[in-house]
Structures are given as C-alpha cells and as structure tokens.
UniProtKB/Swiss-Prot annotation:
Organism phylogeny: Eukaryota, Metazoa, Chordata, Craniata, Vertebrata
PANTHER family membership: MANNOSE, PHOSPHOLIPASE, LECTIN RECEPTOR RELATED
Protein name: Snaclec 1
Any one Gene Ontology molecular-function term assigned to this protein's record: toxin activity
UniProt-listed InterPro entries: C-type_lectin-like, C-type_lectin-like/link_sf, C-type_lectin/snaclec_domain, C-type_lectin_CS, CTDL_fold
Presence of keyword ATP-binding: no
Cysteine disulfide partners in this protein: C25-C36, C53-C142, C119-C134
Other notes: Shows greater sequence similarity to the beta than alpha subunits compared to other heterodimer snaclecs.
A GO cellular-component term linked to this record: extracellular region
Signal peptide: 1-23
UniProt-annotated location(s): Secreted
Family named by the database record: Belongs to the snaclec family.
Amino acid sequence: MGRFIFISFGLLVVFLSLSGTEADCLPDWFHYEGHCYRVFDEPKTWADAEKFCSEQANGGHLVSVHSRKEAGLVGVLAYQTLESPIVWMGLSKVWNQCDWGWTNGAKLKYEARAEESYCIHITSKKKEWKSLPCRNYGHFVCKSPA
C-alpha cells in the first residue's frame, strides 16, 4: 500500500512538473495538454455536477477522458484529493439512446467501463469506470479548455 501511494504521488509530481500551472487556467485548476482540471470534494448528483462544472469555467464540463494517459492523470488527481470511491465523469447515456456520449459533445474513443447503466464514475483507487444511477451523489472532476 505504501509503495502504491509513493508511486501515485511520484506520477502526480511528474505530471505537475511536465504540465505546470498555466495562466489560462483558473486558480486551483491543474493544466494538462491544453485543458484545465479540478477535483471537487462536494458530493452532487451527476446532473448537478455537470451544471456546476459548466458554471465554473467557460466551456467547462464533467471530465471526458480520451486516452490511457489522461485516465491515469484523472485517477491520480482524484485519488490524491478524495477518499470517496465515487468520482463522476462526463459519460452518460444520451437521451435514452443506446449510444454513450461525453457532455462536451466529443466522440467516445477510449473507454474502460465495467458495466452499463446510466452515468459513469471513476473509482478513485482502482481507476476503473463503473456505472451508477445518475441520482446517486458523488464527487467529481471538471475539465475545461485552457
């Protein structure tokens, strides 16, 4: 367990040193590859979290993940900040269709979900994607363009 925390912390330090805090991100937001990220420790339903993210930054949404590297970053940020296993992402069923879609309109290119349901959260420790009813409360990560 101690080694896992040490490695996770090391990854976070590497991400921080490579990305830094850009002037284009709001205070307390983390910059990475042209986007700003922030973990919020305020449990909300998925819809309330998405609304909150859109109010925090121009173009803000619940986090969308498009690569294994970005998934690792989000998992490390969430794990270092939160004790909760539930961290909402911006992936959900779109208007009762069979298609999954990101709240920012981006196409789904990368996924690691464990099962289907309504809204997806990332487990902060294992960094796996799982589904829960959207009415459940969870912490969340917002993402916006830098």
